[in-house]
Amino acid sequence: MSGGQSELSRLLTAAETAAPVDAADVVAEDLRQRFEAARVSFLIVDLTGKAVARLSTAPATGGRQAERIPMSGSAYDEVIRTQRLYQEVTDQGHRVIMPVTNRGDAIGLLELLLPADPGEDVLAAVGEAAHALAYIVIANGRFTDLYTWGKRSRPPTLAAEIQYQLLPSSLSCEAAQFTLCGSLEPSENLSGDTFDYTLDRDTLHVSVTDPMGHDLDAALAATILVSALRGARRAGAGLAEQARLADQALADHGHGHATGQLLRVHLRTGQAQFVNAGHPWPLRMRQGDVEVITCEVDHPFGLSVFAPHPYRVQDLDLRPGDRLLMFTDGMVERHGGKVDLATLLKHTRDLHPREAALALTSEVRDAAGGRLEDDATAMCLDWHGPHETQRHVSSGADTRQASAVREKRQP
């Protein structure tokens, strides 16, 4: 197809012209007309990571009742895991499914039913539209609850709403030097687990926290804790000062205590440091072997009055090819105690952190019969090394890191 750039520009302009709630529908309708498709749909991955919701269908059939489809064993699951297009011939036409992904964050899928076998030009144009759709969804998500609603299988409680808002807007991120993803399986009464990450010019910041209590009390404690950590981090505070301010915030506002782990990795040197505030020790997998990273454990946030000493910043040996797993006690206590986390980490070594983190928390939930007594949270970080300066990108994903085709990177 010629004039690909002009088509992309026209598509973005059309999405910008439409109301935020209609932007995805505009993309779907544009593709339907361009390729005479019988159906074009955008499906968004829900919060569980185990199902998709069909948010837009062109031509529209009226209403916005989302069709929810379990992904396990389906073509949708294959596309999310491999980050590659899927196509098949059906009785109704040629079915094409493309990933809608931004920096490794698997937002959803673009599905088309075409009248004839698509050529390379058509597939390239659809792939380009799917990549553009990722940016369109992210941009318009600031103005509408449509995509948030699509991610939820049921209305959240007040505590759950607070907890969701404390998580990063994207649970997964790919960069040249690292790939990471967090997964949270909430308990029946919500325990306030959170994880967070961000980048500044040359540093990756990661945190995993677990306040005491349940339901709204835990959610409010988590709000104070995460806000204190973010505020300190954004003000340029070092790890020890971030920990001190988080501790002070919980103590000053009477919201009990919380365990946590703060990690900082310098992207240009690979130097890694962390603070452990009464939290479970992390696991590190190196060349297929899993080991516990034993470290000095300081008092939980909020308890400095009983143990008034500074938080210690410790070095962490992190080498290219390592996988680091940070988690909360719900992964190893109660029903989590039935799961051999180290062995499971080995078994999931060929999975992208997105699928690996989900597999780990899902295993704990299954061990509890689907009714967790404590939140189970895992943050999976693959360190590629400071020598890496560029991702190998195809439509928003680093295809070398996809679960089906993960390649060994050499320093």
Which residues make up each language-model segment?
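Signal-transmission linkers at sensory-effector interfaces
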Residues: 1-17, 139
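Primarily the active-site beta-strand->alpha-helix module of PP2C/PPM metal-dependent phosphatases
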Residues: 8, 128, 132, 136, ...
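Structured interaction and signal-relay segments at domain junctions
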Residues: 12, 16, 23-84, 277-278
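Catalytic core of PPM/PP2C metal-dependent serine/threonine phosphatase domains
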Residues: 18, 35-37, 155, 159-168, ...
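A short, aliphatic-rich beta-strand micro-motif
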Residues: 86-102, 108
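Regulatory cytosolic signal-relay segments
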Residues: 129-190
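PP2C/PPM family metal-dependent serine/threonine protein phosphatase catalytic domain
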Residues: 177-191, 243-253, 280-315, 396-411
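Active-site-proximal, acidic helix/loop segment immediately C-terminal to a metal-coordinating Asp/Glu
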Residues: 215-235, 297, 318, 322-371, ...
